[in-house]
């Protein structure tokens, strides 16, 4: 049978598991890490947008050698970010809303780097600002990263960006004049994901070293996948169920854990992860797969921000908890496009998709899972 999560009274916004089983130890760690960052994923999140002016003859090799510079002001960038607000309200089911305001420009010298852009903007931010978004007015080189984001250090009460160093940084590429006012926003959404303490997902077995940003299922992987297929798209894909849970956008009743204390064979109905939370039902299943890792099984609908996908599909990811923050988690694609009749098996676990169906927009699936009893010594 499937065991729903049992919880005690909330502490710092996150409940504590009381199953008493080592099966869910890694999931407990995710909750503890999320608690350490306070309420940054809930409610209105004030961000200050700052333009960083880069000298023409900068020594920072991340920038493309060019005389061309972005013409937008921080106020104009704030206007461009309006769809980003809608993106996060949509995927948080109204539980989270970034609030962007224009900050004072900063300038670096020709011997300073893009890191100094963020540090200078953080140092000047006010106590009410919980995150700083810095946009350089110069483009990055074609082989360089587009941006970066960090949740900063944990906090419980005073969570000002000046204290936590929570920030997002991006080069000018997505805000240059050649976009004619229609900027792609997936990079910004990806970096805000990092500032919400979300890690990358990838098909590689480890998130250390070189990574492939190759999963079209997750804004934290191939964030440009939608517009690569549909040129008018500007948002990234949605994100994985485990990120939504860590952010407290999924509740405990949306998660079920498969009991590995004995042999189990069960059928589970899944609702697509984008279905409104007013409709009750399981959004994802967790199956322990080692001391610090587990599998997640979820149903992703091919619509909205995921309209680039061929069809609704069941996806399996291996989540490995590492380090002391969520961005250290390893989230590896196991299966990304399971359809009717598809099966996966490994480590005493087998998963079969019995059917995927759509009824009046409610995309749902039935899966059958068999799990052998975990042997402990």
Q: Where do the protein language model's features map onto the residues?
A:
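Short, polar loop/linker segments at the starts of domains and inter-domain junctions
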Residues: 62-79, 229-243, 309-311, 329-332
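Zn2+-dependent metallopeptidase catalytic core
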Residues: 17-183
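Extracellular hydrolytic enzyme modules, especially secreted metalloproteases
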Residues: 139-305
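Short, Φ-rich (hydrophobic/aromatic) sequence segments
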Residues: 87-89, 245-250, 351
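N-terminal Sec signal peptide cleavage junction
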Residues: 10-12
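Bacterial N-terminal signal peptides
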Residues: 1-8
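Non-catalytic C-terminal accessory/binding modules of secreted extracellular proteins
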Residues: 19-32, 41, 55, 61-63, ...
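A residue-level signal for beta-strand positions that form part of recognition/binding surfaces
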Residues: 46-48, 131, 216-217, 294, ...
